[in-house]
Structure formats: structure tokens, C-alpha cells
Amino acid sequence: MIWVIIPTYNEEKALPHTIKSVLSQPTPYRVIVVDGGSTDRTLEVLHRNSQISWCMAPKGRASQMNAGARFALQQQASADDWLLFLHADTQLPCGAFQELHHLASDPSSQAGGFRHRFSGKNWRLRMISWLDNLRCTHSHIIYGDQALFVRQGLFTQLGGFPMQAVLEDVVFGQTLLTKTTPRLLPLTVITDSRKFIKMGIWRSFIRVLLIILHVEFGLPTFSPAFFRDVR
């Protein structure tokens, strides 16, 4: 079974496309959306989709994704089931779940993610994605926007995502490496470029570069203001 966990906060624009990309995949799967107190029409989007389970949790990706994992466990997720953490602005490719169903019978496959690119044709965003994919190939640390998947039993054993405001995916990825080497699948997830264009593409590029330097060389982390919400 694949449990898709989507943290949301004011994602009315991108969420319908993300949900569509999930519901077009072959079963079996369950979709759990964990909302952090949206003030837009995100909850209306959820109410229109009867195939989706949802709950509330304190705002913050770590808090919301951990809540989704607990929800899956309460719904009898087994240790070998996949937990797939999907950002609300990121769409799965066709064939994503076939890959996961294929890996399910391989006990050596414990975690992984997908290659990444942004929507649109902006060459600077393509460069960011290329750099990010290269980084992942070298470090084996899966970022949140790469649709991280991990066995439920291993996720629980590791204690879930660390409760911190930023870089929870990076820290979890480092912890994950102590137990397994995540697989980078050849399929590509697509993240809506709207937020990154609004933030400023060069700012986005610098942010990715600084995160890579933090991961690869242990440079200090950055203030939460640097990772402010852009809607």
C-alpha cells in the first residue's frame, strides 16, 4: 500500500493539480492531506474530493507530515507500506506508483525519491533543477520537493521528521542515510514554478546553493525568514 501524505497551507491554486496527478495513479493507495490552518479555499478543494482523507495539525511541514504518518498508522499502515510525502505544489509523473509497487517486494529498497524539475521553460529554473538532481545523485539526500518515499516501519524507527522550522527534510535525509541508501528513481516530479518566480529566481538559486553548501560542507543553517512563505 502507498500512503500519500500532503501537507497544505493556503494551496488552493496548486493543490487541485497535485491531487489530480495522484488520483490518476493505479491503486492501491490512500491520500492523506494535513492542513496547517489554511485561510484560503484549500479546505473547499478537499471537500470536493471524497477519495481524500484529511486532518489538521499545527502549521509547519515537519508537524504536518508527522501527523499524516500517525494518521496512516492509525489506519493500519503496515511496516512495509510506503509513506510518500508530497508537497502540495508538486505533481507526480505517470508511472510513479508502478515504480513503487515494483520496489515493494524488494526488501533492500527502503526509501527514495524522484528527479525534479520546475514547470515552465525558464532556463534558470531548469538550471536549479539540474543542480539539485546532481546534488542528490552525489549525496543521496532526498529533498522534500522530490516526493520522498520511505517504509512506514523505518520512518517510525527514525522518529519521523525533526520538529524544526526549516530543513527538516535535509536533517531527516541525513538520518536516513545511517540506515539505508535512498534510490533516486528516473521519473521526474514537477513543481509549480509560480512561488519561485514570485520569490525571485536568483534568490531561489542562492537558497538552493546555500542549502547544498550546508549539507555538503556543514555550513551553518539560516534564519527561518530566509525560507519565508510565498503564496
Model-derived features: positions:
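A conserved acidic beta->alpha catalytic loop
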Residues: 35-43, 89-91
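Short aromatic/hydrophobic "clamp" motif used to bind/position activated sugar donors
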Residues: 83
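Conserved donor NDP-sugar-binding/catalytic core segment of glycosyltransferases
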Residues: 94-124
